[in-house]
């Protein structure tokens, strides 16, 4: 039997690793679009500032093609480079497009009509077309300029320092748009505003050169649609990571923003490692976790084998990101989320109420975290030289605060089905703690989403146990989402068209699932493949089910 178990463990690990090709292998070639990238060979600040504004206008132009925007973005991100010709070679590595370099000597006075170099492959018609695109801004752009201040674009720029201040102020806004371009691009821009405020405080972003929100949105959309640009930005992020303490201003800025971009789309995986494996509490010994612990081990090996680019799987649209979706390890994910909601107040802003969240194991995590908060790590205590009396004192202190919940510490049971805005909020002492940024970052790959439209969860009894008996419903949306586990004590008729996701073999119901169609009776499928019809008197029948990913 032991040999079978070892073979199963090896099989699980090899499943994650065997599909990878050799590093550096060239994929089959597909059709490529021609992208014209503009190169300025002189350090003239006036010409480079005009090119900066020209690229912004091309990106925001309402009639520009995708290739025009891609070329403008690559040119924009290359402007701080002393040798643009060499820097743009980073984009040549992309198998998605054919990069054509066009050397530019400047612009005609008072216009955005390009003056090409003799070596530039630009026709007169193309030059005229680019000039028209630069003037063709959409009506959503106010004052005929991408900037908030209308006079910024026409200001003289005759010093390198002036150009760098303006260029970095624009580029830092573009980099902030990269942070959410693949994971939560349609979410409110609260995190972007906080980052803008941070960089203004650091002196990296001058408020006078802020772009209009519509211009920022168009930049983000162009980056999201172009794999060539995102591959180019990934190379830039890797260059920034390799820099030492004595780095130039631009790559220090890119390295700082890169911390927000790294591991986006993998938040559920890293939170599971942090709160499930990192705590090392006794529920990890449950037999139900054995297979999923092997899965996590294989994922950690896969992440290590992917190398430096593993941090940017979402930015590169890498298919390996699907392997890290929490739908592949739902039980230990549910347990980790329960632990995290107790230990970390910022977890209240993370959407962990996924369709596959197991309420039973979530509650195990909650209760374990509450009971184990006062335990002492003996190895650390030995390193600190704590006496048995001091260890007991620490345990009693934490237990006393956990029972009383202290001043300003959010208490009460944690319910995964209540939207974060309706959870009990911390006191003012915690208002300066930044929110957990990646609230919806991996929704695309695992299909998870929290309850929307302000739906209320069932009431919670003392001790953290959910009471699924009928509660007064506030609006019709709640009536569609929730129904009680025990219809005989409910004031809701038994024949309503709802689904119950019931844990096979368990007496209590911890997770509800609803009928999205709402127009026909459907059977509810349990987590172990059992089908439970809407009629509670009918016997359950075995049926093979699949998990959500």
From Swiss-Prot:
Any GO BP: negative stranded viral RNA transcription
Compositionally skewed regions (Polar residues) per UniProt: 531-549
GO cellular component, one term: host cell cytoplasm
Biased composition (Acidic residues): 437-447
Keywords on record: Capsid protein, Helical capsid protein, Host cytoplasm, Phosphoprotein, Ribonucleoprotein, RNA-binding, Viral nucleoprotein, Virion
MF terms in GO: RNA binding; structural molecule activity
Chain's role: Forms the helical nucleocapsid (NC) with 12.71 N subunits per helical turn and a rise of 5.3 Angstrom per N subunit, protecting the genome from nucleases. The encapsidated genomic RNA serves as template for transcription and replication; encapsidation by N is coupled to RNA synthesis. Forms the encapsidation complex with the phosphoprotein protein P. Before encapsidation, the newly synthesized free N protein, so-called N0, is chaperoned by P.
Quaternary data: Homomultimer; forms the nucleocapsid. Binds to the viral genomic RNA. N0 interacts with the phosphoprotein (via N-terminus); this interaction allows P to chaperon N0 to avoid N polymerization before encapsidation. Interacts (via N-terminus) as N-RNA template with the phosphoprotein (via C-terminus); this interaction positions the polymerase on the template.
Protein name: Nucleoprotein
Species per Swiss-Prot/TrEMBL record: Mumps orthorubulavirus
